[in-house]
Amino acid sequence: MNFSMIVYILAWVLRIEGISLLLPFICAIIYREHSSAAAILSVSAMSLVVGAVLTRKKPKKIAFYTREGFVIVAGCWLVLSLVGALPFYISGKIPHYIDAVFEIVSGFTTTGSSILSDVEALGKGLIFWRSFSHWMGGMGVLVLVLTVLPLGGGYNMMIMKAESPGPDVSKMVPRVADTAKALYKIYFVLTVICILAFLLSGMPFFDALCIGFGTAGTGGFAIRNSGMADYSMFSQFLITIFMILFGINFNVYYLLQRRKWKEAFSSEEARTYLLIILCSTLFIAFNNLKEMGNGLLFALHHAFFTVGSIITTTGFSTLDFNHWAVPSQMVILFLMISGACAGSTGGGIKVSRLIILLKNMGKELHLIIHPEAIKRIRLEGKSLDYNVVRSVSTYLIAYCFVYMISIFLISFDGFDFTTNFSAISATFNNIGPGLAKVGPIENFSIYSPFSKAVMIFDMLAGRLEIFPMLILFSPKTWKRTN
């Protein structure tokens, strides 16, 4: 285990976090929130000093292997979260540290679940930090590190694979550092377009900025106690469109940028993703015409917003879907689990994995009928390697294991099954709101510190595709090798 290299990269993450904290500090100064500004600046200074000291000298031995790559990813997200929670705690706005950690982990993992009943009491500076954490976590913090700290020797790809969502990470350009830069360029441009669109729709500047960060990262933290209900239907429609756009694999945008139109528009995963959105929107709208009670267009609008919000794992809400018909709630639970496309800022299992699982099931049925047949699974016009199919099955087993254990652990708090099941669905899949006592107009403060710790783990595991978090618990991970 190359501990010196792990500490070196963790320190770089601290430096980036320290610089990032200067933005909410400036925001707090502008709005004359002096206690929040002092708390934010102290954490920023500490991060920059500690980071600078630990990165002063690069380790002599830079070589590391897959297990170090996973530990680096998990460690960086833990450090980022534990330090990122301090402004909330030091300022006194969130008096319990476990709650502050829950809130910022929800931010960085782009979950959007909250323990706050009065968001506006945080003040503008901390609301900005809370929303900006969505944007930082959306594309991946270590992807950003790779743009400023290229490691070479294949180590970049090792880290990128461990952090990036989806069954496979393909390099868009030959060098991984250039891939990271290309991703962030697309991400930044789309975010700017998103914020400008919100401004043109009539949103105040601060709202457009924070909602833009949440939409781009597919996060979902509301900045008002009323959620998204205060904004016009046109603004809500634009939010839906951009949530869906950020839920598409960024490789598609890279292909569009390179004018490879045929490859971009023939993406099987993107077409399936959009088809799921269309079918789910129509079903929920017609299934809830009576419950919504304001006509078909009203039902279509709010169904479209909710479907876009849930499948992309953003978690914004305009209506309380706790009051919708049960079949619609079942569709919402399915969307929570399926998630967006691989290589997007969205969470969940990912549409590409569902496609592979369904095709693998079809292959097995075909082989039962035709035992001598040779049938390969294809995705995006390419024949999939056996290891990719196997990794999807392994991921699903790990996913179900963590899911069941988590529901069991939080059940000791005594809440009903729907609340517990949807709470884990919401946190593990990085959604935000659940059903029943953790629905769109409720929050997660009802749970004990232990259950919050379980959900903190789930949010991190969901964002990091499970294995980087699980590997921390293996004794073999920490054994020294010669």
Map each language-model feature to its residues.
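Membrane-proximal intracellular helices of multi-pass ion channels
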Residues: 1-482
